[in-house]
A protein has these predicted regions:
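HIT superfamily nucleotide-processing domains
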Residues: 1-120
Length: 120
């Protein structure tokens, strides 16, 4: 996998924690436009965050991604999960404060490595 791209203009605000982690974080994996990091407050034995390079506040703005970017992001989720040895896992998106989103930079949670609670 390729290293994350260097900062591109104003697409990565200085005041966004996830933009900073995209640029400077301890990445588990990286590919063009996306990185994976470990969640600092894990809710499962393995709890990773998939961060896009592009600063998009939440899943509500997913339409700003092309179909190809969205596909690459989901393929990256599967690659990272496999690399971590996960065969059974959850992919979760919190879209907005009422859903539990606390950092307003689109990100996907990948949780696995043990039962993480029942979800229908």
């Amino acid at each position: 996998m390729a290293p994350p791209s260097p900062r591109r203009g104003s697409s990565l605000p200085d005041d966004c924690l996830f933009c900073t982690l995209y640029r400077e974080g301890d990445h588990v994996a990286a590919t063009e436009g996306f990185v994976a990091i470990r969640d600092i407050h894990p809710q499962a034995a393995t709890h990773l965050l998939i961060l896009p390079e592009r600063h998009v506040p939440s899943f509500h703005e997913i339409g700003q991604f092309s179909a190809d970017e969205t596909k690459r992001m989901l393929e990256f989720v599967a690659e990272v999960a496999a690399r971590e040895g996960l065969t059974d896992y959850r992919v979760v998106v919190n879209a907005g404060p009422g859903a539990g989103q606390t950092i307003f930079h689109l990100h996907l949670h990948v949780l696995g490595g043990g039962l993480t609670g029942r979800m229908a």
